[in-house]
Amino acid sequence: MNTPSFPPLFSGLAVEGQVDPFDKACAEAARGCDAGLVVHDLGANLLRAALVFAPDVELVDAMAMLPLCGVGFQNALGALGPPEVAVHLEWAGGLRINGASCGTLRVAASSSNPKAEPDWMVIGLELPLWPETDTPGDIPEQTALYAEGCADVNAMELLESWVKHTLVGINTWTEDGVKTLHKDWRGLSHGIGENITMNEISGTFLGVDEQFGMLIRAADTTHLVPLTYLLEGT
């Protein structure tokens, strides 16, 4: 069986069955594994993977890894898939392919204190490859990668490409800050200008602040939902 090949400083850990790569990555990170661990499960119908990071900035700034990994996914699929396939990113981590929901990104960290430097952070990817039913049109708002003209995209190559393009994004973020990431993410963002409810706040999704917090204009004022709201398990 072939195994994925990753850039230097990244290492792979394959799991299968009932083991969730995201949970496994969090457990390994809590035990002190090196940053760059890629836990993955290349299932027949579902691609699941998780990256372990060791941020050296405050959590509120490190949360940029979530949109950064989203941009990395778009770049990865853009390099391997047909040019007409469109990828968009939801603020909360959801992925959209050709307008329909297709997988998600997740995030966890060792701490939920926005001003603390976390010991570790994990970003997880879940991507359906094939529809769950034989009649995918029954749920038009949901899709799968291979139902959107990407049947020639190899899941392992997509995983490798995601890690590679995410690394490029990390290097740019480290050298230049969030300016380029903001530009790239906004060009791929889904839902700006639309009505939304997040953290029990309803209003118009105006965009994001410097640290990718969601700005929602309600009747009374503009509310900010920090990206740390999306942290799991804290």
Where are the regions that the model predicts?
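Catalytic palm active-site di-aspartate
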Residues: 87-99
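Active-site-flanking structural segment that lines cofactor/substrate pockets
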Residues: 31-41, 49
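Long, positively charged amphipathic alpha-helical accessory segments at protein N-termini or as interdomain linkers
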Residues: 1-34, 58-64, 68-82, 101-234
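Hydrophobic residues embedded in beta-strands of well-ordered beta-sheets
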Residues: 47, 95, 213-215
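Short, compositionally biased low-complexity segments
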Residues: 41-46, 134-137
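Short, exposed beta-strand/loop patches in secreted or surface proteins that constitute
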Residues: 39-40, 87-88, 205-207
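DPxDG-like acidic metal-binding loop motif
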Residues: 43-55, 65-70
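Short glycine/proline-enriched loop/turn "hinge" motifs that connect secondary-structure elements
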Residues: 38-44, 115-117
